[in-house]
């Protein structure tokens, strides 16, 4: 092979290898407020967009109200071609307000579900949080901010943050001090290398609540999912559930170590020929 051809082949293989090393699929968005006509957001159930740009998830005048908001575009959280799983970081703020003559219920859940997710047909009663049937079962992974203790779902006796996997009977919970009218800021991180879902909840007085749990998203969810929020109320339990802001970034490496190694071997063989 002529020297120029050797150099050109070497250069192209090197470029291809470098591209594969850096190849990733990224989804990123940021909502400081919301509007009803935004095509990037899907609404389900009793959602209302307020004039101040907040999303109110439930209808206070309706028994067993359920409302959900989702990012409209599906996100690929793992690859069937490579087996790789995405890592993600999301931050959001919300507010829950008690109302007169009702128990404060039932809370908000940040959830991940199949891309065709809808409010479950049997999702009545506040304890379902709009993501499960009346037995507590569904197809989702979520972080719940629960303000009502439902004994049928083994809730602890206090307000709590819980990590849910296909059920509102949480796999792990920690106590949390929910304050009516307080703006709560949350950061959720999923580290695909350790399969760990970590959550930090900051109340407006500076108190921080943390919780973490190993969750294999590839084993629990399909390749393409949607991210969103849901809330629900019941006959005697209602409160105002507001989503104020939301940012999100996910990264899925789209190449395998094997494909990178193969290119590197080709480069070394060409260099030694």
Swiss-Prot record:
GO terms for molecular function: carbohydrate binding; metal ion binding. Residues 1-23 form the signal peptide. Ca(2+) binds at residues 146, 148, 150, 155. Keywords: Calcium, Lectin, Manganese, Metal-binding, Signal. The keyword Transferase does not apply. D-galactose specific lectin. Belongs to the leguminous lectin family. Homotetramer. This is Galactose-binding lectin. It comes from Arachis hypogaea.
